[in-house]
């Protein structure tokens, strides 16, 4: 599974500005989803890869980004 990293309290994606390989996105994806996750910046949001199937990614149901 893969998808955008989401802030559970706001419902917003984690923003990034350096597209492609991005240390910030990689670190944040691994912190939230574990060491096996990958991450890079895609369309100005942190995109996480190699996630477990139950991983929660953006968009959150019933929670819009404010």
UniProtKB/Swiss-Prot annotation:
What Pfam families does the record tag this protein with?
Answer: Toxin_3
Task: Outline the extent of the LCN-type CS-alpha/beta domain.
Answer: 1-66
Q: Which domain of life is it from?
A: Eukaryota
Q: Which Gene3D superfamilies match?
A: Knottin, scorpion toxin-like (3.30.30.10)
The similarity annotation says:
Belongs to the long (4 C-C) scorpion toxin superfamily. Sodium channel inhibitor family. Beta subfamily.
Domain text: Has the structural arrangement of an alpha-helix connected to antiparallel beta-sheets by disulfide bonds (CS-alpha/beta).
The name on file for this protein is: Beta-toxin ChFII.7
């Amino acid at each position: 599974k893969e998808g955008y990293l989401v802030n559970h309290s706001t419902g917003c994606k984690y923003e990034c500005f350096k597209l492609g390989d991005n240390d910030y996105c990689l670190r944040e994806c691994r912190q939230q989803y574990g060491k096996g996750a990958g991450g890079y910046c895609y369309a100005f949001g942190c995109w996480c890869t190699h996630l477990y199937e139950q991983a929660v990614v953006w968009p959150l149901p019933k929670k819009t980004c404010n």
